[in-house]
Amino acid sequence: MQQTTKLFLGALKYSIPHLGKCMPKQNYCNVADPYYNRLRLKNYRLTKCLQNKPKISELARNIPSRSFSVKDKLEKPESLQKRGINICMDAFEKVRTRLETQPQEEYEIVNAEIKHGGFVYYQEGCCLVRSKDEEADSDNYEVLFNLEELKLEQPFIDCIRVAPDEKYVAAKIRAEDSETSTCIVVKLSDQPAMEASFPNVSSFEWVKDEEDEDVLFYTFQRNLRCHDVYRATFGDNKRNERFYTEKDPSYFVFLYLTKDSRFLTLNIMNKTTSEVWLIDGLSPWDPPMLIQKRIHGMLYYVEHRDDELYILTNVGEPTEFKLMRTAADAPAIMNWDLFFTMKRNTKVVDLDMFKDHCVLFLKHSNLLYVNVIGLADDSVRSLKLPPWACGFIMDTNSDPKNCPFQLCSPIRPPKYYTYKFAEGKLFEETGHEDPITKTSRVLRIEAKSKDGKLVPMTVFHKTDSEDLQRKPLLVHVYGAYGMDLKMNFRPERRVLVDDGWILAYCHVRGGGELGLQWHADGRLTKKLNGLADLEACIKTLHSQGFSQPSLTTLSAFSAGGVLVGALCNSKPELLRAVTLEAPFLDVLNTMMDTTLPLTLEELEEWGNPSSDEKHKNYIKRYCPCQNMKPQHYPSVHITAYENDERVPLKGIVNYTEKLKEAVAEHSKGAGEGYQPPNIVLDIQPGGNHVIEDSHKKITTQMKFLYDELGLDSTDAFEALKKYLKV
């Protein structure tokens, strides 16, 4: 239902079972847009300094211490699938070649990649390879393993880890249409060979013991649940043994190696609570050390530097994240000293630790910041990032002098930045200036929700657009699990803006844009806050001259389907069309079915309708499947996946049947000439959740939106071609 780099917090967020692809400690990781966010510029130079004197932080203070129409009967998935493919094949063929080739003109697609010693390890074609660091951009590389040996459909490397002394390399590999991963271990020699393989691996890390033997720790995933940790050795002393089993089914486990490799952290987590154990990176056979026993509602994550633990936690008031510090040999909570705290409504996006600095990536008032803390003198420098930026893409870096990262937006590809500690300045890449900077605008506006709460929105439109009220509008929403609405670069979003569309991203309660409390105010028995926020956002957009209901469309994936489905029931007059992908729509029946793999882990977000009548009645108030009635609905296009374990197909089909019945009932009394909405269910093969974006899927969804608004889709594809020539 839910939908992460190194980095620290980004890696740990991946452990939430609803996340997709993750490459902790790899560059260019993003789970919602994995194709387009494996992009990097082929050539760039960091020469332009953005400022001379970073200002003291205003955010923080340093403290000492998924076809069928309504006229059709339900068909078999195979026929639906074929129909869905045929709908837009002609349109797709017009732009496929350019879609597939253009990104390589200025960008290259980057899969998992990691630097270790003097080598770079990465995927080239269908192989795991390595090359010398200085030859990384050439064709001079050594093949370590052919992924085709695993006989997977379109396999790719999800994550790479190299043993400390480079005797072994481990890589997690999976198929594009599956969430099941296999971890292979390759012995590095003159003739590299696969030493072992482990199925169903989620996270994994290397450490070295006192005998200089490489030890691989990994978590085993069963039915989407990670409860077991194993450790394995290779060579003459080969073994594989279970190290830890979590017995509480509502928790999951995840491994994270501190940046200095001193400790391997065993993180035991659910949506609201965590517990961390430290495994000595020098003595991995010793018993692990508990940092703090789990306390309901208390979250914490651990990094290490110079015999000190840096703990990001929500303990204490306000119940937002703050940074604490304690000696590594005295990790208990009573020894934690408050080191740094964020201003209210600030989202901690990530944290990176360097030799002399700690870098916090923050979001405040819907804008991005970087705070650099000097660990020697506790100084704080706050950098307000360019207002066009909507998302960070973290880079790993072993250079203690520089902190590199990328910034992006839904309509602007990633751009490199580097903060240089010695100079105390932020530098951006120079060279080709993206024309979108002059042809589009990004606005931050707010909507007042029913209870008076101000809800932030991010809006994009063409600079030279006239009469915005007559322009089509595409609204995006998520609002669950404390996760931010994904705002990474997507070429089709840019095409829409170039073609005159308005894009609006609504950061409603239940998401994480304004911190932990923003999530708390939109979960359990406060889910209706998110619905009220979404309604207020769309009404505010219309009242401020951004489009009108007959030109308004709404899009969401996964858990975002709850709010979209609920709004279609309560305020269908606000919308003309909706696109949903792998949507969660049958909340009540799903949460009452404890045989589903993730129900128990979802209780903290949706409640327990099986044992709590209050939760059951509350869910009934907003659950999309429970509140449909004969009325005029917007047209709906749903993309679903046959073997999706996170959002079962059964619930989506049930929703679609009920929606079709409600539309048919309304049509009986609507009078002659009434045009019912189109209800399309496109069932795709595969078992992944929110599968990799294919060009075919993109064009199908775009064509649906254009057709429903009565717009000529040919213009859109011509606009796409024009953009691709830029």
UniProtKB/Swiss-Prot annotation:
Sites of Phosphoserine modification: 138
Recorded family membership: Belongs to the peptidase S9A family.
Coiled-coil stretches: none
Any one Gene Ontology molecular-function term assigned to this protein's record: peptidase activity
Pfam families membership: Peptidase_S9 (PF00326), Peptidase_S9_N (PF02897)
Primary enzyme class: hydrolase
UniProt KW Cytoplasm keyword: yes
Enzyme Commission numbers on file: 3.4.21.-
The protein, known as: Prolyl endopeptidase-like
Subunit structure: Homodimer. Interacts with the AP-1 complex.
Protein origin, superkingdom: Eukaryota
Organism expressing this protein natively: Rattus norvegicus (Rat)
Active-site residues, record numbering mapped to chain: 558 (charge relay system), 644 (charge relay system), 689 (charge relay system)
Cellular component per GO, a single term: cytosol
Keywords associated with the record: Cytoplasm, Cytoskeleton, Golgi apparatus, Hydrolase, Nucleus, Phosphoprotein, Protease, Serine protease
Protein function: Serine peptidase whose precise substrate specificity remains unclear. Does not cleave peptides after a arginine or lysine residue. Regulates trans-Golgi network morphology and sorting by regulating the membrane binding of the AP-1 complex. May play a role in the regulation of synaptic vesicle exocytosis.
Name of encoding gene: Prepl
Subcellular location(s) per record: Cytoplasm, Cytosol; Golgi apparatus, trans-Golgi network; Cytoplasm, Cytoskeleton; Golgi apparatus
